Amino acid sequence: IYRIMKRSIWALTEQIRHGTFQPAGYEVDFMQVNELNVQNMMLDEEHKMRLVGKIDRMDTRETEDAVYVRIIDYKSGKTTFQLLNLYYGQQLQLVVYLNAAMAQLKKEYPGKEIVPAGIFYYRMDDPMVEADGEDEEKIMEHILSELRLNGLVSLEREAYEQMDVGLQGKSEVIPLTLNKDGSVSKRGTSGVAPVDF
């Protein structure tokens, strides 16, 4: 457990260093945004269901006219984000968290647009990679790539470029790959257009 925690702390720190997003909240309880209606669902005219939970980590990046937000949920198992599961309502956790975070940020930044940048799982792990005579720096790059965030990234250039500044090719941080011409590759990318978020 100690080795996995140590590796995860290193990887999470590196992921933050690669971009300009900063943690804005840890263990953000829905009760902290008690007056929000985003987690309330009307079942019928008389009954309401209230969703409760905690957002493991909420990162933001503020610009002159917008606040970008990404949600990260820590997982110890092999949970992976599947867009089809989201479509069929089987994997709603990250979307519910994003909606709650966006509602909270709208109250905190009333004059700014709140822009979803991504919803991600981070798998707590200490993966083994093949060294094949590579130097330590290359090995660490492989490990970071194995631990990259898993989820859905906004294909808005401003969003993904700020999560992995200087990105060329396959990101070690987010599920996104760029072609040589700088366009987003369909292979190695799990993303949607900003309007679809």
Enumerate the predicted regions with their spans:
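Structural signature of nuclease core domains in nucleic-acid processing machines
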Residues: 1-197
